Amino acid sequence: MSASHHLLRLQCVRCVSHFLGTPVRQVILPGRAHLQTPGSQHIYVQLLRPFHRSAVCSTDRQNRTDIEKLVEDETHHKDKTLVTHDDIFDRAAGDSKTKVEFNRVVDVFKSKDIRRRGHVEFIYAALKKMPEFGVECDVTVYNKLLDVFPKEVFVPQNFIQRMFNHYPRQQECGVQVLEQMENYGVMPNIETKVLLVQIFGEKSHPIRKFQRIMYWFPKFKHTNPYPVPHVLPSDPVDLAQFSLTRIAADLDAKITIYQYPSTDITETGEEITRPHIVGIQSPDQRSLLAKHNPCKPVFVEGPYPLWLRQKCVHYYLLRADPIPPEEKVEEEIDPEMICPEQSLFFPQRVELDLKVDMGDDHSFNVDEVEEGAVYAMCMAGQGDQATLSQWISGLQETCPILGQIPTVFRLESGPRELQTSTDDHQRPEQEAETDQIIEDDEEPRHSRGVKQ
């Protein structure tokens, strides 16, 4: 018997109770309902058998975990917004945000409801929380998120559904998962394709996105001739050597370690930390420094950032000002290099502008900014003037003329010298005293900025 007939019979029972105007007691019999009213005859009406709820679907289980309770509370008390699962990851993980906790939250959501209600909002919230758990570069976690989608529900069944955007919100969510994989450089595997085919079908937008990724990723995988390793050295000295070698354009450049990181304890019990100092200099830079005019200063500038994947290091330069045009000396051309007897196949000198082609527009001109020569580079654990002075002292061993050249330190605030939040709440009296100290100490600081 259909459900509509059952509902009509239940409504008839309520009408009988309203017509008699007396309370009715229902006694559930195997196939009939015995309606008893005080002072009336027995009326037998066939009623629907009571529905029994399975023990598996009961929500009063005693062995529920904390995450299951959080997911259930979030489902019952969720807002009408699009994303309502952001707090589940924070409250479930607590302080330990690891891959295990992330997978645990996903598993609890999958086992909560077989229909996966709210799975799109959950996937968007999980994508946003992946960098906090450190799983943004793990392909297995992305496959686990794709497994949250119901299978064979969003697959188009005819050509009309394929022609239009079938279930656009779910397809857009699947494309967003692949977009994040592409942004973090994660290569999909065969399991990703199987999941996408089971969820959206073979002619869907996520499958087309998957095909584009698999076409372009192998082509650009080895295009960089100087790749950065995925695991960087943990030792600061090794990391500095790798970074300076990557910056230097000369293969003959030599790396020198002027000081290793160490910690000493004085007789008074004071702890002194010595940072590492690693420098690099090529033979051409050394010869240019030897020709530098001792009357003109050289400058120590920095720090300049260098990004190695997600890690940022800083380096410093020893450079000079650009040479004025009136002091430039043109190189004399050897007449033997341009004589008619030179070989046409191996010419010693060719006066051709290789930067300009025959069809180029000569009216467009780009002003090239001239910069001074760079004599050396270094990386140090601390960017203060005392530490960099030790680097200059080490350079004087190979370039004695550096002791006769004045050195000016033009240093900016490094990463360890940023203003903290406690300095923002400084009292006006303290600020006035600080300004007075700076004004009094301004002239000695200029004198200390130049090292003779």
UniProtKB/Swiss-Prot annotation:
InterPro entries listed in its UniProt record: ECIST_C (IPR029342), ECSIT (IPR010418), ECSIT_N (IPR046448)
GO cellular component terms attached to this protein's record: cytoplasm; mitochondrion; nucleus
Bias (Acidic residues) ranges: 431-442
Cysteine pairings via disulfide bonds: none
Keyword set, alphabetical order: Cytoplasm, Immunity, Innate immunity, Mitochondrion, Nucleus, Transit peptide
Subcellular location as annotated: Cytoplasm; Nucleus; Mitochondrion
Transmembrane portions of the chain: none
Region (Disordered): 413-452
Classification via Pfam families: ECSIT_C, ECSIT_N
Superkingdom: Eukaryota
Single GO BP term: innate immune response
Transit peptide (residue range): 1-58
PANTHER family for the chain: ECSIT EVOLUTIONARILY CONSERVED SIGNALING INTERMEDIATE IN TOLL PATHWAYS, EVOLUTIONARILY CONSERVED SIGNALING INTERMEDIATE IN TOLL PATHWAY, MITOCHONDRIAL
Summary of the function given for this chain in its UniProt record: Adapter protein of the Toll-like and IL-1 receptor signaling pathway that is involved in the activation of NF-kappa-B. Required for efficient assembly of mitochondrial NADH:ubiquinone oxidoreductase.
Homology family: Belongs to the ECSIT family.
Name by which UniProt lists this protein: Evolutionarily conserved signaling intermediate in Toll pathway, mitochondrial
Organism (species): Danio rerio
Gene: ecsit
